[in-house]
Amino acid sequence: MKLKHKHLLNLLQVNDFKVQNLDLKIPRNLFNKNKYFDLYQIYKELGGIQEEFPHIEEELYYIEPSTIIILDDYIHFNRYRNITLRSILYEQIPSFPLENYKRYCRNFEKECIKSGLPQRIWANRESDYYFGPSSSPGDFFKNGSGGWKLLAFKDLLEDAAAYAINYRVIRFSVYDNFLAEGKLMRLDNILDTPTHPLQQQLLKYIIRRIKE
């Protein structure tokens, strides 16, 4: 578990949130290419080469009632995630911070590059299967990064799968800002350490997002 994710989970647990891991297993026929929003079209726009979708294998944080908490770190914001954000699915989820996420994808891809060039992230066996061989790390002019595409599409699948079973997904970004002591603070700066003095202000922001 990544450090920021661990600190977020601990913050929720010590403040009496009942949190458990959720393995979001979804029937394969849910994502029939002709029936469920525009997932198939988005997959093909990303360069998908199979007639099936990837499995969702991430462990998500589940809290009552029927709510999933996800923390998106730096590698989730890039040109490929921006493509998935065009899905008409997001028109059905008014609580999703769509404009913020589009802006993060446009403005912070350089940060994604800093952490997203290692081979297991840029390309791997699964991404080769679904999107074909990747270009050299950092080369976006050919096939680009299959690993980044895979991660972006799985984010979309998570949102679609949760919507299909009437779960709420609340996505927090490391780039989110919240007001604390009269100043805008960025989420990643607070989650860098579990003893940050503004932890309680962060908790209030999280609770407000959950209740929206």
Report residues per predicted region.
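Nucleic-acid endo/exonuclease domains
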Residues: 1-212
